[in-house]
């Protein structure tokens, strides 16, 4: 038998290299950004703020309404005239601020709008605001702590006067002691005079017994039937009958 013929391998074709998709280009790596050079600051001097020569708009408007004191309220034209004459400012520049304040003050209740709507019309202060303005005037008249110190000084003076008043009390005590000594001297004299009385008291005690005997004797002769002598009258009556 013959040997089988060796198989011949077919050459392997290389796979086609994938082509990059169209439209997408590979981005090159960005170079690091260099730090920006700082711009030199301008050394220009700042303009100083000019201080306003007039008070705030709210204060000017409220002052205008309070000084005008119109019953129906002050109009926008009257407020503008007052501000221009009182504060000497360009009112036309302040008109938008005045209108804004009038609207906000009506919403808050600081001003009352008597007529019109918005910034047009007439405005006046509410009655409650007038009372609040009057109250702070009465507050500064209450300095009371000064009155506490002089009271202590007067109390010390009274304490000094009390020991001086004790001298007349000592004189009274000496005067009262003198009559007390006189009474003590009078008492032994009365005891000596009273000493002989108890000796005579014993015979005197017998006298009341004699008086009692005399009283009893006086009572005995008083006979009650003697007082009944008027009972003899009925005896006279039968004698009168015999005469008839």
UniProtKB/Swiss-Prot annotation:
Compositionally biased spans, kind Basic and acidic residues: 35-45
Keyword vocabulary terms for this entry: Chromosome, DNA-binding, Nucleus
Cell location: Nucleus; Chromosome
Nucleus recorded as keyword: yes
Occurrences of domain H15 (ranges): 53-127
Biased composition (Basic residues): 213-244
Disordered as annotated region, ranges: 1-59, 113-244
PROSITE patterns, sorted: H15
Protein family per UniProt: Belongs to the histone H1/H5 family.
Protein name as it appears in the record: Histone H1, orphon
Organism: Chironomus thummi thummi
Lineage, broadest ranks: Eukaryota, Metazoa, Ecdysozoa, Arthropoda, Hexapoda
